[in-house]
Amino acid sequence: MSTRRSSRANKGQHSKREIDFYVDEEDLPSERKRSLSNSSQDNKRPHLDQDEDDGDYKENGEEKKDDDIEEEGEVRCTPCGTTSENYDEDSDQGGTMIECESCKTWQHAKCMGYRTSKTIPKHYRCNVCSGLNGDKLEKTNVDSSAISEKLKDKTRASVAKAFVNVFKRNIPESYKSPEGMDNEKLSSKWAIELEREIFIWCPKKDKKYTDKSRSLMVLIKKPNVMTRLIDGELSFTKLVNSPPEEIDSELKEYAERVRSESIRRSVLTVDANQGQRIRRTHKGEEIVEDASNQQEDVDISIMTRNIDHRRFEDEEPARGIIVNDNSKPAYNNYMEDEDDDEVGEEEAEEKQKQGSDKEGSTSDDKEGLPSSDIDDVPDLDDDELDFIIKGKKETKEETRKPSSIKLPPIFSSKIWSGRITFPDFASFGATGEFYTCSNYKNPTNPQEVKLHNRYVNISKEILSKDHYEVEGRLDRTRADAYLDKIITTRDLILVEIKCTENRSGYDKLYRYLLERNKVGVLSGRPAFVKDAYLLGIDGNDFNLPEYLKALHKMVGKVGLFALYIVKKDYVPTGPSILKKSTPNPTDYNSHSSNASSKEKTPLLDSILYKLGGNGTKKENIQIQTPQYNPPVAQNGLPTSLTTDQLSYLSGLVQQNPQVQQNPQALIQLLQQQKNTDYSPYH
């Protein structure tokens, strides 16, 4: 009697059944390939017991219905001690169960020594009915259970057991195993070593681990790979870490053939018989149309569209082009003129030349046309197009003559000199040079020069003092995280600090900031600067923050830098606005050199008011209307300004020429002059 399968087999899959994925079904006869989840319907068997879920089946041409709805038999698995009393179908971990044909009891297939479904015989009898005792079964399972003892993890144990089966079937019989080892022990040893290498390569035991195990099982089955393993030419480490193409030469050759075939199919080919270009795509072969290939069966109405109808107008020929010996185009209107007699002979010669030149070039296009008069008419369209193209080429050559573009003046990067002090730690003299900023490039065109000069002016406006102190310290990690986020909404400006005095103090501060992973907070930052830091930067560090890598020329740079976080797209008021220099006294002849600072405030307030700068008005200055707009002269200054006010403004504009085209900058300059103690009359 053939083996019965319980309905338990398809009610829950045990985790160890994943070993079945690694079994090669090609190694077994076709009649042995059957599923444990469904009952077999092989008509060749003389007897077949169906479960209550199997339905009807046909045997020897007669339809029978399974009326055997009896209860499932008793569970009696002596190796593991499972009985009907302690057996729970949902929580059982023993795997597939099989029924004895003699006593109708159920046992675990693996407890009976059947590791896979392929090893279960057609006619099964349990260990009691067959006369096998438990000692014999335990002895047969010693070698197969050794892997489970070494590999506690079920997944790893299943993969290792699958490798054991592969090695057993593929190790040649002619191979002499080492002393004290047979084929089975050698297979177990190699399987454990190979699984260990896979686990090292992918310790997560996920899909990547499973796919790698399957691919290696396929490789091991190849005779050339097994030969390399036996000879010691290929180690398990190399087998796991190398791509399959390097392990199997046949697979590499196949991949090369596939790659070359793919390239060949993507190349356009020409059919010599049909004169057509063919492109092979995933949709099949496509014919690529060529303008030079004319179809013989094209409608004559389509052909007439390409004919210039001016060729048929003999009475008043259209404007043509006469080509001289130097191939330079010249026009002929073909109109009656007083000079026709003088140029008539030249026209006749040129027409003969044009007719002979065009005869060969247009013979293909005019083939098959009904009229023979077309052959004598020159193709004017091509000549006109050639003339237009030549004319454009000449204009391009003329525009390309200026080889170099004159760049505007580039401001010097040296912007500051003074002293930096870290109280009770270090102090040194230094200079500051603008080094880089956000979106900065080396100035090679006028736009980049303008950007460079703008950031130089901003840097000068920032570093307006002679002495700066380190007011505090921040952790570099927190500062880097903050700067990585703020770089998208602010501009970063880096000024390189170079030592001019007390090099030891400079080096001491640099090493402190770099080794202690600190950032110094600088004093004296203007209102438009959000933060000012002093950084020790090593551009060769692999852990260089992303905001520094994004800046130009920072990779590989080493030194002390002042970093300023500025408002996005900030426009400086000019490099000389904050410069407190005494004006030339010749510009103020109408003023006394002994004027006091009290005289300046009313003057500036009046100027600011008249210019719309919201100056503070004194009691003796009366405002008639809030919307008063003073008349403006041609030079851009209000005509209501007094001589003293005009003279004062003239001196400021001479000192700061950049405000001449920027009225708002002039107002800001006046406001700054008002808020300082400096007086131009001292």
From Swiss-Prot:
Residues 1-93, 309-381, 576-599 are annotated as: Disordered. Its main location: nucleus. It is found in: Nucleus. Belongs to the BYE1 family. Negative regulator of transcription elongation. A zinc finger (PHD-type) spans 74-132. This is Transcription factor BYE1. One of its GO terms (cellular component) is nucleus. It comes from the Eukaryota. Residues 335-349 have a biased composition (Acidic residues). Keywords: Metal-binding, Nucleus, Repressor, Transcription, Transcription regulation, Zinc, Zinc-finger. The gene is BYE1. Residues 1-14 have a biased composition (Basic residues). Residues 579-596 have a biased composition (Polar residues). SMART domains: PHD, TFS2M. GO terms for biological process: regulation of mRNA 3'-end processing; transcription antitermination; transcription elongation by RNA polymerase I; transcription elongation by RNA polymerase II. SUPFAM superfamilies: Elongation factor TFIIS domain 2 (SSF46942), FYVE/PHD zinc finger (SSF57903). It comes from Debaryomyces hansenii (strain ATCC 36239 / CBS 767 / BCRC 21394 / JCM 1990 / NBRC 0083 / IGC 2968).
